[in-house]
Regions:
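Acidic-and-aromatic substrate-binding clefts and catalytic sites of carbohydrate-active enzymes
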Residues: 43-48
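Glyoxalase I/VOC metalloenzyme domain signal
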Residues: 1-12, 17-37, 49-51, 58-117, ...
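A short acidic/basic microdomain associated with nuclease active sites
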Residues: 39-41
Length: 260
C-alpha cells in the first residue's frame, strides 16, 4: 500500500493522541470495532526515546496512540502536553525529501533540530524506520508539528492491520488569530492558504489542515481546547451508508473525530 508522496508533494501522514494509559486507549478503540496494531517502543540514533505506541492504520494515513514509558526528554515533553489535556497533540506531514524540508524550514526561521533517525521494532522483531524533522515547540506551539519519511512502509501497512474504507482527511488547528496562524502554518508546510467561511484551509496532495477560532471549531466539533492547540481530525469513509458525523472519543483518548 503506497503511502509515500510523489517528489515535490506533501501529505497529511498521521496525527497522534498523547495518552497516559496506552492499553486502556487501545481497548476502547477495539470496542469501537477498530483494528489496533501491537505495542512497539520508539528509539533514535541516541537510544530509547521513552515512548511507545499503538496505531490505527487506514487506507491513507494513520492515527498514532502514544504514551510516555520512561524518564527521557522526549517522554517529558509528552507528559507536559498532557498536563493541558489528553488528546491530539501531534500532526505529521509525509515527505519524500526530509533533508530538503529541513533546509527549507531553517531558511524560514523555524530552527529545525538535527534530522532524527527514528525506529521501533514490531512485535515480531521487524524494525520500522523513519527520518523525522522536529522544530522547537515555541516555533509551532499548537502541538508537536513535524515531518517524516517512511523507510519501511510495507511493514506498517500490513494487510491484517488496515482499517478498510477509511482515510485520514484533515487536522483541525485552534487559533486565537486564524489568519496569522494559518500564514505561519503555510510557511511551515510550503503551501498556499485559502479561506473557507469561518476557516482557513491549507490543502495538500493528500489531506489538509483546517485553522479556525475556538468558537468556530466548537460550532463544528462540539468542543475544542483553548488556543494554541490541535482540536481533532477528520476521517473520510468509503463505507456504504456512512453519514458524516462528529464522534466524541472516550476519555482514555480525548479529542473528537469528524467521520463520514
Amino acid at each position: 500500500m503506497d503511502q509515500r508522496p510523489a517528489p515535490g508533494e506533501l501529505c497529511l501522514d498521521h496525527v497522534a493522541h498523547f495518552v497516559p494509559d496506552l492499553q486502556a486507549a487501545a481497548r476502547d478503540l477495539e470496542k469501537l470495532g477498530f483494528v489496533v496494531t501491537p505495542e512497539s517502543a520508539h528509539r533514535t540514533q541516541h537510544g530509547p526515546a521513552g515512548t511507545s505506541n499503538r496505531c490505527l492504520m487506514f487506507e491513507q494515513g494513520y492515527v498514532e496512540i502514544l504514551a510516555p514509558t520512561m524518564d527521557t526528554p522526549n517522554a517529558q515533553r509528552v507528559r507536559e502536553r498532557m498536563k493541558s489535556f489528553v488528546g491530539v497533540h501531534l500532526c505529521c506531514f509525509g515527505t519524500p525529501a526530509p533533508a530538503a524540508e529541513h533546509a527549507r524550514l531553517a531558511a524560514h526561521g523555524f530552527e529545525p533540530e538535527p534530522l532524527v533517525n527514528l525506529a521501533r521494532n514490531l512485535q515480531d522483531g521487524t524494525p520500522v524506520k523513519f527520518n523525522v524533522v522536529y522544530v522547537p515547540p515555541a516555533k509551532m506551539p499548537e502541538g508537536r508539528i513535524q515531518y517524516c519519511e517512511h523507510l519501511t512502509e510495507s511493514q506498517m501497512w500490513r494487510e491484517g492491520w488496515v482499517n478498510r474504507g477509511l482515510r485520514l482527511d484533515a487536522a483541525y488547528v485552534v487559533a486565537a488569530d486564524p489568519a496569522e496562524v494559518a500564514a505561519r502554518w503555510a510557511r511551515f508546510m510550503g503551501v498556499l492558504p485559502r479561506r473557507d467561511g469561518d476557516f482557513v484551509e491549507l490543502p495538500l496532495a493528500r489531506g489538509k489542515v483546517v485553522v479556525g477560532s475556538r468558537a468556530a471549531l466548537v460550532r463544528l466539533l462540539g468542543e475544542a481546547p483553548p488556543a494554541p492547540a490541535l482540536a481533532g481530525y477528520a476521517l473520510s469513509s468509503a463505507r456504504p451508508g456512512e453519514k458524516r458525523r462528529v464522534v466524541k472519543l472516550p476519555p482514555s483518548l480525548g479529542g473528537v473525530w469528524v467521520i463520514g
